[in-house]
Regions:
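Conserved, single-site charged/polar hotspot
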Residues: 2-485, 493-494, 501, 529, ...
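Short, acidic Ser/Thr/Gly-rich low-complexity loop/linker segments typical of extracellular
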Residues: 436-442, 514-521
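Hydrophobic beta-strand segments within extracellular beta-sandwich modules
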Residues: 458, 535-537
C-alpha cells in the first residue's frame, strides 16, 4: 500500500494530481459504452397542475387532459398509500397490483448503481480513504476532495491500471451527495462514470424514501421496499459496468441523505422479501399514479406479462395527478415537434382496455396522416401518462379588417368535443363576454357570422380553456365625391373631429397631400383643383375603429 502525499501517480487512462488533501484527475478517455434504458420507475415529486382558466393566444391549440402519472404498470405508489390508509397490509397490496404473485425470500446480493456520468465530477472523504486499481495495487489518500475530469493523459508517470475503486470507513461524497459502498471510477466515452457497489439492503435505504415519501403509512413503505427489491434483482445487468441507473431511468437513488428511520424500518421488516411469479423474481414495475386503473403490459409494451394486467385502483384520488390538465400546446409548435408536413388539424386516438392511448393519428391540413404510439406522443409533448384525451381548437381568420355594417364569417375546428362556445371582447372593454354557442359538425368543423360595430377580439371557450384568438378590426365607411373644385364626402358612423387625409398614389405608395377633420355631421372637404392622378381619402377616427379608406378615384 502506497501513501499518497504531494506527487503524481500515472493511473493508466488517468492521472491523479494530489496536493495535500486536494487532488485533480485527468482522464485520457476510453471507448467504454454508455447506453441508456427506458424509464421504469417514476418519482412522485413534481409541480401540481393549476385548476384555473388556461388561456392561449395562438390561433390553433391542442388542449390535453388526462389521468395519472407514469407508465401505469404494476404498483401505483399513490394507490398503495390509499390502500394502506384503508387498512390493507403490504402483502395484500402487492398481491393486488401484481396479479397471481406470491412473496418469497431472495439471496443476499450486491448491486452496482451509476451515480455520476459527466465530463467532470468531484469525490470527497472526511477521513483517510483508499484507491485501488484493476491489478489490486492500492494507495492511501488523505482526507479531502478529488476532482475528476476528462483531459489528455500525462505521460511518463508511475502507473496503475483503471478502473479505480475508492473505499472509506465513512460514506464517500460524489458531487456533494454521500454514498455508502465502494465507488468505481472509469472513463466512458466523453464522460467520467462513477458506479456505487453496495449491498442490496443498503441500496434500498437510498431508494425507498427517494421513491415514496417517508411519512406515508408503514404498509405502503413496506410494499415499496419489496417492489424496489424485486425490481432491482430482476434487472441486474451483465455486460456493462453497472446494473442500474441511479435515477428514474431505473430507480431514484438518493444515497445517505435520502435515508429515513421510517423507510429503514420498512426495509428491515421485509428484509430479503421479493415478489415471485411461478418461483421467479418478478420485474415489479411501479409508478406514481394510475388515475383509477393500472395498465397492462400488452397494451403498454406490446408483450403480455401475466402479473402486469389492469386492476382497479380506487384510492389514488389523493394524488394531485389523479386527474390533470387541460394543458395547452400551440398547434404550430406541435406540428413542428411531430415533423408534420402541414399545419396540425387534430388528433385521433385509439384507446386500450385500461383507457390509455395505444395509437394517436395526427391529422394535417393537407389531408396527410401520421400515426404514433401513445408513448411516443407522451414523450414528444412531455405528458404525465398515456391516459389522455386531446382536444383541438382553431378559430379563423386570425386577423381581418371589415367595414362597419358588414359581417365576417368565423370558421374553425373543435375536434374531441361536442360543444364549444364563442366569447368576445370589444375595444375599450376589459372583460370577455359570451357571444353564443357554436354548432360543431361531426367532422369537428363549425362556422358562425359576426357583425361587430367596433374592433372586437373573439376566442373559443371550452371548460376552463380559452383559445383560438381572432382579431377583427372595424373600419368606418368613407365616401368621397370628387369635383372640379376639390373633393368632399362623409364618414360613417358619425365621429366628430375625426382625422381625414387626402392621399395620392405614387407608384406602390400613397402620399398624404392634405389633412382636415370631420364636422359635427361627419362631413369633410378639401378645396382646390386636383392634378391628374389616382387619389383616395383616409379616415382614422379612433374610438375602437380602424383607419378606413374611400374607394380610389382617378382624376384626369
Amino acid at each position: 500500500m502506497t501513501r499518497v502525499g504531494r506527487h503524481v501517480l500515472r493511473l493508466g487512462a488517468a492521472c491523479l494530481l494530489l496536493v495535500g488533501g486536494l487532488a485533480s484527475s485527468i482522464f485520457a478517455g476510453s471507448s467504454l459504452g454508455f447506453g441508456s434504458t427506458a424509464s421504469t420507475a417514476t418519482s412522485t415529486a413534481t409541480t401540481a397542475t393549476a385548476a384555473t382558466t388556461t388561456t392561449s393566444a395562438a390561433a390553433a391549440v391542442l388542449a390535453i387532459s388526462g389521468h395519472g402519472w407514469g407508465h401505469g404498470l404494476g404498483l401505483s405508489q399513490w394507490g398503495a398509500d390509499g390502500y394502506a390508509r384503508h387498512g390493507w397490509a403490504y402483502d395484500r397490496i402487492l398481491a393486488h397490483f401484481y396479479t397471481g404473485t406470491t412473496l418469497g425470500q431472495a439471496k443476499i446480493s450486491t448491486v452496482r448503481v451509476l451515480v455520476a456520468s459527466a465530463a467532470k465530477t468531484t469525490l470527497a472523504s472526511a477521513v483517510p480513504w483508499t484507491v485501488t486499481d484493476a491489478a489490486g495495487q492500492k494507495a492511501v489518500l488523505d482526507p479531502g476532495k478529488l476532482v475528476l475530469e476528462r483531459s489528455p493523459a500525462i505521460a511518463a508517470q508511475p502507473s496503475l491500471a483503471p478502473p479505480f475503486t475508492f473505499a472509506s470507513t465513512q460514506p464517500i461524497q460524489v458531487d456533494g451527495r454521500a454514498y455508502r459502498g465502494r465507488l468505481t471510477v472509469s472513463g466512458a466515452g466523453k464522460v467520467v462514470q462513477v458506479v456505487d457497489r453496495l449491498g442490496l439492503e443498503a441500496y434500498l435505504r437510498g431508494v425507498v424514501p427517494s421513491e415514496m415519501p417517508s411519512n406515508w403509512p408503514t404498509e405502503a413503505l413496506k410494499a415499496q421496499a419489496v417492489a424496489a427489491r424485486s425490481y432491482t434483482l430482476a434487472n441486474l445487468t451483465k455486460g456493462r459496468a453497472f446494473d442500474l441507473y441511479g435515477d428514474t431511468r431505473d430507480q431514484a437513488y438518493g444515497g445517505v441523505a435520502a435515508e429515513s428511520a421510517s423507510a429503514n424500518a420498512a426495509i428491515d421488516a421485509t428484509k430479503g422479501q421479493v415478489v415471485l411469479y411461478q418461483g421467479k423474481v418478478a420485474d415489479a414495475l411501479y409508478f406514481s399514479t394510475s388515475g383509477g386503473r393500472t395498465a397492462s403490459a400488452l397494451e403498454s409494451i406490446g408483450s403480455p406479462v401475466p402479473y402486469l394486467v389492469p386492476v382497479a385502483d380506487p384510492y389514488d384520488t389523493l394524488s394531485p395527478y389523479h386527474d390533470w390538465g387541460p394543458v395547452l400546446f400551440d398547434a404550430a409548435k406541435v406540428a413542428k415537434e411531430l415533423k408534420l408536413s402541414a399545419p396540425l388539424a387534430g388528433l385521433e386516438v385509439v384507446n386500450g382496455p385500461s383507457g390509455r392511448v395505444k395509437t394517436v393519428t395526427a391529422l394535417s391540413n393537407d389531408d396527410t396522416q401520421v400515426t404514433f404510439t401513445g408513448n411516443q406522443l407522451r414523450t414528444a409533448l412531455g405528458l404525465r401518462s398515456t391516459w389522455f384525451a386531446p382536444v383541438f381548437l382553431q378559430l379563423l381568420p386570425a386577423a381581418k379588417t371589415m367595414t362597419v355594417g358588414g359581417a365576417v364569417t368565423l370558421t374553425g375546428s373543435a375536434r374531441g368535443v361536442d360543444r364549444v362556445s364563442l366569447e368576445a371582447k370589444q375595444a375599450g372593454q376589459t372583460e370577455w363576454s359570451p357571444a353564443g354557442e357554436l354548432t360543431v359538425e361531426p367532422d369537428g368543423r363549425f362556422s358562425t357570422v359576426v357583425k361587430p360595430s367596433l374592433a372586437t377580439q373573439y376566442r373559443l371557450a371550452w371548460g376552463t380553456v380559452r383559445a383560438g384568438l381572432a382579431k377583427i378590426a372595424v373600419a368606418p365607411r368613407v365616401e368621397a365625391v370628387p369635383g372640379p373644385s376639390g373633393v368632399q364626402g362623409t364618414v360613417h358612423p358619425l365621429v366628430a373631429a375625426a382625422a381625414v387625409q387626402l392621399q395620392q398614389q405614387a407608384g406602390t405608395a400613397w402620399t398624404t397631400l392634405a389633412s382636415t377633420a370631420t364636422d359635427a355631421a361627419g362631413a369633410w372637404s378639401f378645396a382646390g383643383a386636383l392634378v391628374p392622378g389616382t387619389y383616395r381619402v383616409r379616415c382614422a377616427p379612433g374610438h375602437g375603429l380602424a383607419p378606413g379608406f374611400s374607394t380610389s378615384f382617378l382624376v384626369q
